[in-house]
Amino acid sequence: MGAVEGLTEFLPVSSTGHMILTGHLIGFDDDRAKVFEVVIQLGSILAVVVIFWKRLWSLVGIGKVTDGPSLNLLHIIIGMIPAGVLGVLFHSAIKEVLFGPGPVVISLVAGGILMIVAEKFSKPSTARTLDEITYKQAFTIGMFQCLALWPGFSRSGSTISGGLLARVSHTAAAEYTFILAVPMMVAASGLDLIKSWDILSTADIPLFATGFITAFVVAMLAIVSFLKLLSRVKLTPFAYYRFILAAVFYFFIM
């Protein structure tokens, strides 16, 4: 499960869908499994921190990535606001209504359609690099990140699609998505971990540590490979994969 999490967390294929399917197939889907998923997700987040550490330092005023105008902390805050507000207001409702096999199948298909539409109707990029993203584009991407509150939609799938429609290049949208994910995922995972702390025991440490490390290593490889691949293959192949996954999900889980 650590490998599945690391591979799918930052690809536009829905890590949630893969984790539910994997947990079902191996018979690991109880409350302890849910805490395990939170822990290995933190391993994936650490991979982003390691890969983009210079950029993250620059956001808090330590060091500069470029001499000219560059991505700053306000870009990240603006991108966080829409999903952050909705997540806080409707956290319980989202958990109760959208966390289930049926909604996940629907979101897998809907997310795939969004990606195809974004590729078809996107215009030439005005922001080809991360440092050319405007505040308006950051807010647009943040609005599309709200879709990721629906399990199965995929954070990267929805935000990269939003970036394309806002005239941000594939690579710049993906890099912004990964950086934007750090505070959002740390906050969400931290909250879930605190709420589930009483489920953990010292006997779980070896299992959780193995999953954490595996997710970290695989996520490192997945992020680097995805950024190299994205400029050549675009989002469409991932959209078709989502349709296949939705069919598998429907027949094996529902």
Swiss-Prot record:
Any GO molecular function: undecaprenyl-diphosphatase activity
One Pfam family this sequence matches: BacA
Lineage top rank: taxon: Bacteria
Transmembrane residue ranges: 8-28, 33-53, 74-94, 97-117, 133-153, 174-194, 207-227, 233-253
Topology relative to the membrane: Multi-pass membrane protein
InterPro entries: UppP
GO terms under cellular component: plasma membrane
Keywords on record: Antibiotic resistance, Cell membrane, Cell shape, Cell wall biogenesis/degradation, Hydrolase, Membrane, Peptidoglycan synthesis, Transmembrane, Transmembrane helix
Biological processes, Gene Ontology terms: cell wall organization; peptidoglycan biosynthetic process; regulation of cell shape; response to antibiotic
Enzyme type, top EC level: hydrolase
Function, in words: Catalyzes the dephosphorylation of undecaprenyl diphosphate (UPP). Confers resistance to bacitracin.
Family statement: Belongs to the UppP family.
Extra remark beyond the main annotation: Bacitracin is thought to be involved in the inhibition of peptidoglycan synthesis by sequestering undecaprenyl diphosphate, thereby reducing the pool of lipid carrier available.
The protein's name: Undecaprenyl-diphosphatase 3
Organism: Bacillus thuringiensis (strain Al Hakam)
Source lineage: Bacteria, Bacillati, Bacillota, Bacilli, Bacillales
Gene encoding the protein: uppP3
